[in-house]
Amino acid sequence: RHTFIYSSLGKSCHLSYQSYTLPCNCNHKRIGLYYLLSTFLFGLSGTILSVLIRLELCSSGNRIIPPENQNFYNLSITLHGLLMIFFLVMPGLFGGLGNTFVPIYLGAPEVAYPRVNNMSVLVIPLSYTLVLLSLNSEFGSGTGWTLYPPLSTSLMSLSPVGVDVIICG
């Protein structure tokens, strides 16, 4: 969106471009804000999974998750672990706070390698999409906390495609 800033004489003296879309600039404060906003959204989905896991554990006779879908509990533990570690804690602390507050504390005008920060901000939603696509594979990738490639070729009730997609994400 283009905005003109007018001087007191009515002449346009400056043309500025304001972008409210994906981060297409290398301003470290804006990139840090995108990190913090994305970690907030991923944290909400991780919190929903945490509440679902706790409700399942506290109800002894009544089950929240239907008994026909036994792998969904393991799948929710896998997704909860990935979301909380790799989509909430690491991008929030390293990307969000590291890009927003650390340069301000140090008095640095810019950060080193801002284009790499920009690229990693754009890769996070793609990675989240791959993690969600692993849900739609055959049985899902309900491996719990153990995510490693031999599980993708095992004869267990896991989806080999789902494990590969969640490792790639």
Question: Which residue ranges define each predicted feature?
Answer:
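...captures the hydrophobic TM-helix bundle architecture rather than a specific catalytic motif
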Residues: 1-169
